[in-house]
């Protein structure tokens, strides 16, 4: 097929279409895997959570109501120090830079979050989806970055609440790591509710959870054209030293 080997592979609800690409190395051509196309979906109807990794598995469960199954957060946890969210489920073994991530969200408190471009517990973005405007609550309702220190807002101060009530809402995160664009959509309006250009983290995992409250998720769908993120420039990340990071993680993981 024009020199490209194409195969179909399914695991944990994922379907990927990898192709073989060519890269110029020195004076010769060397074959290397091209970024893989990825489609993942989880409606939790199977009753299994094999596709997800949790900081505290006992805090999460699948609930059935009226024949519909969804992921429920039973318990919130204290944020980490430096102050940032820790209570979110990550999609196992999947990293992407260019992607569309969609999910249905329902809050029990005032807010929930969607995490993306997750590198480690001190380096990631998250969309904070709140009942509040950022003008009323400076750390609510917007896109935030955790970059080795306390979370910081990068956009969304004037946006309307992403989750104005305790009903289900459809949320979508669109990310293009090449252009740096991040757009977050909520069904409360037609266009993006939050938009920003930021290239700090070009690749990482995706997750769903809350800063310090509880709620529900359903119908998670991820579509990406660069699963695996070849050559992510993670060297640009400003990291704290490894010993300090391990001490901080050990401290923040205590009940």
Regions found by a protein language model. Name each.
Residues 148-170:
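Short, aromatic/His-centered strand-loop micro-motif at the edge of beta-sheets
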Residues 193-219:
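Flexible glycan-contacting loops in extracellular carbohydrate-active proteins
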Residues 78-146:
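Secretory/extracellular carbohydrate-interaction modules
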Residues 44, 103, 167-195:
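Carbohydrate-binding surfaces in secreted/extracellular proteins
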Residues 3-4, 8-11, 233-255:
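Short, low-complexity, charge-dense intrinsically disordered segments
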Residues 32-56, 227-231:
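Extracellular carbohydrate-recognition regions
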Residues 44, 220-222:
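Extracellular beta-strand elements of beta-rich domains used
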Residues 48-77:
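Extracellular glycan-recognition surfaces and repeat-rich motifs
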């Amino acid at each position: 097929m024009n020199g490209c080997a194409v195969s179909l592979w399914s695991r944990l609800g994922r379907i990927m279409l990898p192709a073989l690409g060519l890269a110029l190395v020195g004076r010769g051509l060397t074959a290397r895997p091209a970024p893989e196309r990825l489609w993942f979906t989880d409606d939790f109807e199977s009753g299994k959570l094999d596709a997800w990794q949790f900081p505290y598995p006992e805090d999460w469960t699948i609930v059935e109501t009226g024949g519909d199954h969804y992921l429920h957060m039973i318990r919130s946890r204290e944020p980490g120090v430096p102050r940032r969210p820790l209570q979110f489920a990550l999609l196992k073994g999947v990293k992407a830079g260019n992607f569309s991530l969609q999910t249905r969200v329902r809050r029990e408190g005032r807010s929930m979050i969607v995490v993306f471009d997750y590198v480690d517990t001190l380096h990631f973005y998250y969309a904070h989806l709140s009942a509040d405007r950022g003008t009323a609550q400076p750390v609510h309702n917007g896109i935030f970055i955790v970059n080795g220190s306390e979370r910081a807002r990068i956009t969304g101060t004037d946006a309307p609440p992403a989750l104005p009530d305790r009903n289900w809402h459809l949320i979508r995160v669109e990310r293009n790591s090449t252009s740096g664009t991040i757009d977050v959509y909520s069904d409360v309006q037609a266009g993006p509710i939050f938009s920003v250009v930021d290239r700090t983290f070009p690749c990482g995992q995706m997750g769903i959870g809350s800063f310090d409250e509880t709620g529900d998720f359903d119908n998670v769908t991820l579509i990406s054209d660069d699963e695996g993120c070849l050559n992510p420039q993670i060297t640009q990340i400003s990291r704290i030293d490894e010993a300090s990071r391990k001490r901080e993680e050990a401290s923040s993981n205590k009940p």
